[in-house]
Amino acid sequence: MFRRFHYPISDTIKKDMWILDFGLGDFAQVGMAGIFWLNRQDCNYFGHEIYLLPGQMIPEHSHLPTAKGAAKMESWQPRRGMIFTFGEGDATPELLGKIPISQRDLVKSRRCNPLEIDQVGHLNRLEAFHFMVAGPEGALVTEYGTFHDMVGLRFSNPKAKL
């Protein structure tokens, strides 16, 4: 996918990129790869690249406050491909079919906002449940956010885990 998108595969990416199926055993449908470029508690900011296969979903989740910091706020910018971001609000029934069947009955977030290359979408409120699904080509997404303490991460799917 990186080669198809003409994305440079640096030594840092080769060394530090991680790949997750969230313990669900269905990586092609529900999973992600990525790299944390920075996660600064002292300055309260975070930089992350998300790598998604075509139609792949990050499990629905929220970020709660912890002893180390406030709930995480985040924004997303597709750099290659496109994504469907799902969050709270009025449902967009015409786009619910983008959610993998294995997750469709488990998610709370039913408001979809498609994002094309270089459009930026945002979490609509702190602690809101949300997720994204890659478009048909897959997606490389830059995520901007406040400090991320993994202790505050909560999944709506009780089987999902890091």
Question: Which ranges hold each PLM region?
Answer:
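Conserved short histidine dyad/triad with adjacent acidic residue
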Residues: G31, E49-A70, G89-T92, E116-G121, ...
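Glycine- and acidic-residue-biased ligand/ion/polar-headgroup-sensing regions
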Residues: L53-P54, A71-P93, G97-I99
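A short, N-terminal "cap"/entry segment at the start of jelly-roll beta-barrel domains
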Residues: M1-F46, S102-D105
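Double-stranded beta-helix
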Residues: D90-R110, F129-L162
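A short beta-loop-beta micro-motif enriched in histidine and acidic residues
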Residues: I35-G47, E60-P78
